[in-house]
């Protein structure tokens, strides 16, 4: 009997440790400067995945991809959304179409299309590019979304989307962006709520950063998602 009880206790401890490891692996940083929203940067390896919850009413995903973690949607994105009680994404914002930003997004759209998840996705938001004929990933995401019944929106600098008291201002790309240089033409978002400002920079390089500075678009912010995962070729000192 003692062996059996010890075995049960030990098994419970193992499960608890495993659950803790899974939670740590999924969530890298949780940032909540105000009660009306929460920003979670997920540990997706070499890639990006950010979930923003707003006023307990709206949830959005900003990018979701990785080049070194397989089945990101199944093993990281969906489990995290479930752990937060999120059954609907009001928007998935794709900054650009490199694999390390879209692999998990593609999976989520496929799951919705095949009715393999209860998650609902309302909108897929892409940068407005004039030349997408050679961009297979862009066309694939658009087609998947349409097949899954997800509305596709394209945005450019000057556009703005509101979720209650939170505003998402599109700072980039310019209306003339072709999309041939996916990094430099990536979507840049500024999130504004009361006295808070956050900046999501995709993978823009220093050339685009300099243009945004010259245009007076880059101001002091409380939260910065560095471009190119913190690469020395992006997010300059200014």
What are these regions (language model features)?
Residues 1-238:
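Non-globular, low-confidence helical/coil segments that flank catalytic cores
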